[in-house]
A protein has these predicted regions:
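Alpha-mannosidase-like glycoside hydrolase catalytic domains involved in N-glycan trimming
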Residues: 1-37, 44-47, 51-159
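Acidic, contiguous internal or C-terminal segments within carbohydrate-active enzymes
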Residues: 36-43, 155-180
Length: 180
């Protein structure tokens, strides 16, 4: 017998006289409708959460390069137009309106919703995960979407790298949205 995932089965004993009773276990399809969906977009590598088919948010897990945005950013702010990942954008309101912004021309390092430490000291140097200077969050490839009737979630692993080289922090992000 190989070790594997276990399942627990529970039931209430029906009323009746003591003695031997027979039960039949039947496998049926769940009657529960999966309202909340979390899935990876194959084209972009990002993860989308939806509620009854309506968009809730996009988790930008795969690294996004600035692309054409760099040309629009003034020379003083160009150093902040760096490739980034590990953030939410867009986040949608209950009426479908976009609540976040990305790639601002005057602050190109600002991005939707993200967690970042503004000053990271490493081997005598100072980096800034918020301003994308020397420290960058990068996906490890371990990202698990979960869908269900009550909530959808994304459990993602990222690593904070110094100059995209040495690993500083292993981050586990859990993003969960509940059915409206």
């Amino acid at each position: 017998n190989q070790a594997g995932p276990t399942t627990q089965l529970s039931w209430l004993m029906p009323p009746g006289p003591a003695g031997q009773r027979s039960f039949a276990l039947k496998k049926t399809r769940p009657a529960i409708k999966l309202e909340m969906m979390a899935r990876r977009d194959a084209a972009s590598g990002q993860f989308d959460l939806t509620d009854a088919g309506q968009p809730v948010l996009r988790y930008n897990y795969a690294t996004i390069a600035p692309g054409d945005v760099v040309a629009k950013v003034d020379a003083a702010n160009r150093i902040y137009a760096q490739a980034r990942s590990d953030y939410i954008h867009p986040l949608f309101g209950l009426n479908g309106e976009t609540l976040t912004q990305d790639w601002s021309v005057d602050h190109p390092h600002h991005r939707g919703i993200y967690c970042a430490w503004p000053e990271v000291d490493w081997r005598g140097q100072r980096g800034d995960l918020h301003a994308l200077q020397h420290v960058f969050a990068r996906p490890t490839g371990e990202c698990k979407p979960t869908s269900g009737p009550v909530f959808a979630q994304i459990e993602a692993e990222n690593v904070w790298l110094w100059e995209n080289g040495e690993s500083l922090v292993n981050e586990r992000a859990i993003i969960r949205a509940y059915h409206a």
